[in-house]
Amino acid sequence: MSSIFKVAGVTATLLVSLSATAQIGEPFIHDPSTVMKCDGKYYTFGTGGGGLISDDGWSWHGGAVRPGRGAAPDAVKIGDRYLVAYSATGGGLGGSHKGSVLTMWNKTLDPSSPDFAFTEPIEVAWSEDGDDCDAIDAGLLLDPIDGRLWLSYGTYFGFIRIVELDPATGARIEGNTPVDIAIDCEATDLIYRDGWYYLLGTHGTCCDGPNSTYNIIVGRSRNVTGPYLDKLGRDMLKGGGKMVIAARDNMTGAGHFGRYVEDEGVEKMSCHFEADFNRGGMSVLAFYPLLWNDGWPVAGEAFREGTYEIESERRGYALELCVDFQRMEGGKHRFWEPVTEPLQPLKTQTLDVVIGSWSDGDINVRIGDYMFRPHQKWTITEVPEAGGYLTSPYYKITIEGTERALAATPDAEVITVPQYTGAPEQLWRIEQLVDGTYRIMPKEVPGHDGNLVLMSIADSTPTLGEYDFNSDNCKWRFRKP
């Protein structure tokens, strides 16, 4: 394990250019804890003490405070307090596997708050040289069903174990005996969903920059103490595990999983990549949508700029301008007549052919059959100066080849305006949901508090309304034209 990395003098312009998948700012960290939100800000802690803070979940910088140094912390909120666990030595550091896991409390994670004060750490797990488990790499789970608190820990140098803690004190429950639940992984995390307990572990080689093969695997169980089986039924206690995420997006060494539930059906996963090739091989904090496929977690894809069809999940129609449909000439062949001449490709309809018939002012939008026409092609572009949200920057959505922008209105409708201005009602939040569809949300709706999303109120009618994950009206897909 190594300390948090910090780099000075990197310009914002450079970081924006590298921001397709990892966070911007200075997101340099190793072994990040599960992300916690406290008083409107986001926090994560890492190996070596300290950690990162973000005002919006997109731009990160140093400043989080965690005493004790050590390695591989985790955090959980219990009531109105935060419990932080971390490891002192162990993990083969300095050639020793003697270590301990400690827990401590704080009322707030904001180091500038007068209430900021960590309690004295309590030892809850330990190991000696020669033991078959390494007391390092803490993972915390507060069971949402019965309120019990669990700690997983361990590395490649033996078993992964689970032990029960007291959620009132953070101490180990007296007489509780650790249970072996996995081998051949480390940096474990426990989560619960829909009647299943999931054990996320980090598999592969660590701490070798661009050569690190770290990847995140998972098994699940009906019982928190196991057995944890992968999708093929292999026990993680015998080396099983299903892949969640590995190297991607020019980054290697995915490790130290964390889950963040934003809303019903909106989940994010955090991890580090041991080497971001676009940032000189630095270890960075990264986020991805967390998808659930047949009861198994898998990392989604970071949304990318481009030109798309925006398709409603309700019926499969596409978002389009309310303009007259202009027919194309040619290409009509009587199917019963023989082909007597070589066939030539048809050219698609181009913007210059139709734009002269469009209004110069605001144009409403509707949903209709997709015909890859200019009034149905939307270019989605990052707006880095507008900030962002957990995982991504805000985007502008314009008709391809124009500055005609999708915008929210004071009466909670959607229109297009002739010119993008950067107004908050023209900025959009795009988030992949756990089923692989997306929700599309304006940064602001003039005169409205709270969040509204783009939805299909009828097969052909888009509007803004309350988000409901259980309704296809709120879901969209992006397809390349």
Language model features: what each stretch is:
Residues 22-136, 142-185, 192-245, 264-306, ...:
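Beta-rich carbohydrate-recognition and catalytic domains
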Residues 29-32, 70-72, 135-137, 185-188, ...:
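Conserved positions at the start
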Residues 33, 74, 139, 189, ...:
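Short, surface-exposed charged micro-motifs
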Residues 139, 247-261:
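Signature of short aromatic-glycine-proline-rich micro-motifs recurring in repeat-based ectodomains
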